[in-house]
């Protein structure tokens, strides 16, 4: 029996590898065809737009082909996702979370602050929290907390916190993809928002977590190629500045440029940066879309290996993105510094007309407007401009502008646009699926006493997907929020509302009352601090507000536990089974 099982497993893995090779070859051939069109002189606009649209079509097709009506596939990808691919997919989700703060990768340290918090949180999620979820057999972090604290009030609170943070991430991912499609291909914003919303639904709707994870793995591959190809091309032509990362000469110069342009914010001091690290790490460690890859693996060991793979690939692709941003900043500065405002590269005027680059503090449509804007700042006609007078909007623009600034061709521009769009779709679909799981499984199934029909649960899931996708579409069209604000808010909600209760879950004296007090205290502390802060525009402000919620919620929960009855046999038994017991400690879900 064991030999037959091993042979069957080997056959299934071979079939899986063959399918992955086919998908990878399809993407590579499509991108190679775009490069060929660029070489033979096809219109630049067509060559630059073809790869992004193919990427959207390819990811949507991949998600649709994985459709299933089985609960085990829809909610957990059949518990059959190999660790290497699960980690690769999770890297795409985490990288998309980092894109709104992408300039910090090239312009600041990784050890502390928002970037450091992301890596610490990913390590905690991948090496401990995720494997714990997989060991216990739950579908999400909210289900684990609901099993530990069983009152209806705490269940509603946990499900609401997961749904809110996941919805914010879905909107952020959609906005990242829409912005890339609009800014780098010139697409109409309404059309781009509709296309991204439809693609997100097609990926997450038919196949659930299976479609989301495999699409995210493909997105990670596209991102590796998209960010890595320009760096490789510059290296082959000996045009890549040395020391682009880790404090080299070019890295230091790029960091100064980014700071002078205002692309990277001014540091707020070591205490604030340290607080940001803690809050962001706790937010990542308890974020449902980040933990979803662990749920889809074979067992706890596979989940831990997936965490290691996710950390490795996140670092690798983040290094490529940091090098690309730094190279783009240096190329842009060298192309424009010393030039009069009426003789800047045409690409700068085009970007300024779309609001992506300011010239002398103004958005201009051509040389004459640039000359007038600089004259208002005291520049004489024909006087050369300082590099600080040409200010890009953000790090995403610098990523997309590298091929033009370094004259790598339209195909490279399309490849980077594809990478940004693919990462945005990975985050959007992961957020959609996590929110739908919270409502369709954690709420509808568990709260109804585990008696609901699978078909009804999946129907509720898909209705939730449509509602959240519609909200993301409206957010993308109106442009009311920025991706950075949405991601920071999601991390703050997750850290303030879930982290204290997760810590209490390991304390035998904590019961339903303590969890409810911690949950409510975290929410009150977070939203009160946000109200005092007004309209926060930096992730550090959201992190400080989250830390206020964590402190209040954790403190109240601890105080309540110390004043409660110390002997809680049920809590002690649950913790013992959770940490030292066999896997699948919860009653298995029917269909799973």
Regions found by a protein language model. Name each.
Residues 71-138, 280-283, 302-334, 344-376, ...:
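Membrane-interface helix-loop-helix modules in multi-pass membrane proteins
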Residues 29-38, 62-68, 167-170, 174, ...:
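Hydrophobic alpha-helical segments and their helix-loop junctions in multi-pass secondary transporters
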Residues 37-50, 104-114, 174-192, 210-219, ...:
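Transmembrane helix-loop boundary segments of multi-pass membrane transporters
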Residues 13, 70-87, 487-592:
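C-terminal membrane-solvent junction of multi-pass transporters and transport-like membrane proteins
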Residues 13-25, 43-72, 78, 139-167, ...:
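Membrane-interface loop-to-helix entry segments
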Residues 10-30, 110-205, 275-283, 289-292, ...:
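Helix-loop-helix module between adjacent transmembrane segments
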Residues 15, 148-156, 163-167, 316, ...:
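Loop-to-transmembrane helix boundary motifs in multi-pass membrane proteins
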Residues 1-21, 65-67, 336-364, 369-375, ...:
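Terminal cytosolic tails of multi-pass membrane transporters
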